[in-house]
């Protein structure tokens, strides 16, 4: 399962149909990106389903322009998490991959640029996320 964020709303790409709750399920082959975004804004959460997860991801990526980015969850020795305030929202430091960079290099550079912290190290990979921007 992958989650794709559209502001506070989420598109869930899955190869399993979730049971037990009312869901908004759409066939990715039959819906445009504009309709997907319109529906997720209306319902706050939608599911895009295909029995073959790799085909689902491939089909979804054909509908959008994928831009690689990296960032990090920064914690101090008190286990407090660092957030930055940008575009009128609290967020984690992150940004686009520069040509020739690895995802780790991007994460370290972006966190340093956005927070000023220089003594950084990557401890663990947490997750891959996708976001849709205008």
Spans of features found by a protein language model:
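Short, flexible N-terminal segments of the mature chain
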Residues: 14-37
């Amino acid at each position: 399962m992958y989650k794709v964020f559209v502001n506070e709303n989420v598109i869930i790409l899955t190869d399993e149909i979730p049971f037990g709750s009312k869901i908004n399920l759409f066939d990715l082959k039959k819906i445009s990106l504009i309709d997907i975004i319109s529906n997720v804004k209306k319902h706050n959460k939608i599911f895009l389903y295909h029995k073959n997860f790799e085909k689902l991801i491939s089909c979804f990526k054909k509908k959008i322009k994928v831009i690689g980015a990296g960032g990090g969850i920064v914690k101090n020795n008190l286990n407090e998490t660092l957030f930055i305030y940008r575009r009128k929202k609290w967020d984690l430091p992150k940004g686009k991959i520069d040509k020739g960079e690895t995802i780790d290099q991007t994460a370290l550079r972006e966190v340093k640029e956005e927070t000023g912290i220089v003594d950084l190290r990557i401890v663990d990979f947490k997750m891959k996320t996708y976001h849709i921007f205008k």
